[in-house]
Amino acid sequence: NLQETAFTECALNGANLRGARLTQTVFNQCEMANLRVEETPLDGCIFNHCTLTGSHFTGCSLQTVQFMHCALEDSHFDRAIPERSVFFESPLTHARFAGCRFLLTTFYGIDLRTTVLEGSQFERVVFFNCDQRGKNYARHGFTGCQFTENQLDGADFSGAQLTQCNFKGASLQTAQLNQVNATQALFMEANLRGAQCRGSVFDQAIFVGATLEQADFSQSRLFQSILQQVNAAGACFTLCDLTYSDFTGADLRLADLRGATFSRTRMHRANQENARFTGRQGILEYDEEVGAAEAWSRQRQ
């Protein structure tokens, strides 16, 4: 029974704590490489500045567990269930999290490029300032997750569920977002230059201030999406459903909108130089209410 026990600067390399009662147990600056704690519930435990390389947390229930500045390279968390847990600036190089169920868990400032996350489910998980370039998240489920300020260039989200996810300020250059469901997702100020977003659902998604240069949204649905002030020069929106979409102030130079469906689609003050259209029926070239608000704003300055 290690409930509420505190270990400080202890040598615990290779320790076997399987089946131990680990509730509100604290480990400070301990050497714990190759720890074995498989299939054991951890509740409210804190690992602070510990060496945990090669440790085995396979099948563990991790309730409100904090890993703060820990070395977790080559560790095993397969089939674990982290809930309300935190991985803070703890290297996870070649660590394994296959088949995990993450709920309300935070990854802060971690390079996840070599971390195995295949077959895992993510609900309301926060990835803050993490390097995830080139990650393969094809057909993974992300619900209400935060990818704020993440590096996701070249990541593959093909067929993924991204409902209500937040990619504000993230870099998604050349990322694969084909056949995704990104309903009500947030892409404010994100960089999707050259991203592939074909055949996807972006209903009520918000792209305000995003970079969409050369991105391909062909055959996608952007019902009620907000694309104000986006840089979509050279982007492809062929055969898209742009019903009630708002391109106010957008840069659409050289964009391809042939075959797109328009219905009360706002193009107020959008730069459409050399953009290609099959027809313009359903486009609102000038929004009187927005124009009046702009005039009022200028008078107030």
Residue ranges and their predicted role:
Residues 1-301:
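Tandem repeat scaffolds
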